């Protein structure tokens, strides 16, 4: 399964782009509206975290700027009545931390802002999100999460994707970011993995 893709933009679609790799293969990648609207020009480099969905009749790639977005997409598509297109619409309307904030504030009505989601569907989705989205106990009621919170969640979802628990990951992440708060996601993730491997 494809989880990461890097290449240059060969073509644009209405809700997607074609990413050509150095091997000469082009992949159509479906994107959230914000990501699609901020793509660079043809021929320029892009990289996405990929959710590769395989069905009987088709394979599709969905691309995200952060690992947190990808993992949230996977959570959303695991909810009954939420397909890949609905999940993509949700992430076009809300960033992952915005969705967590909706859960914290029990703001079911906010979900109806997403195209194709009515009140009953919003209630159903909300109930499942309460148990499936990772909520940090220190989250605030601000609707605009800080860069630090976003970085924390990106690293956390990355470590959980590698099999580490939320509890052990959180301790290591806080330790790493306390000493080096300016790290990017990739560097911080590597630091955390080193600490976890050392035990």
From Swiss-Prot:
Primary localization class, coarse: cytoplasm
Residue segments, region Domain I: 1-65
Gene designation per UniProt: ruvA
Region (Flexible linker): 144-146
GO MF assignments: ATP binding; four-way junction DNA binding; four-way junction helicase activity
Gene3D superfamilies cross-referenced by the UniProt entry: 5' to 3' exonuclease, C-terminal subdomain, DNA helicase RuvA subunit, C-terminal domain, Nucleic acid-binding proteins
NCBIfam families: ruvA (TIGR00084)
Known partners and oligomeric status: Homotetramer. Forms an RuvA(8)-RuvB(12)-Holliday junction (HJ) complex. HJ DNA is sandwiched between 2 RuvA tetramers; dsDNA enters through RuvA and exits via RuvB. An RuvB hexamer assembles on each DNA strand where it exits the tetramer. Each RuvB hexamer is contacted by two RuvA subunits (via domain III) on 2 adjacent RuvB subunits; this complex drives branch migration. In the full resolvosome a probable DNA-RuvA(4)-RuvB(12)-RuvC(2) complex forms which resolves the HJ.
Keywords for this protein: Cytoplasm, DNA damage, DNA recombination, DNA repair, DNA-binding
The protein, known as: Holliday junction branch migration complex subunit RuvA
Organism listed in the record: Lawsonia intracellularis (strain PHE/MN1-00)
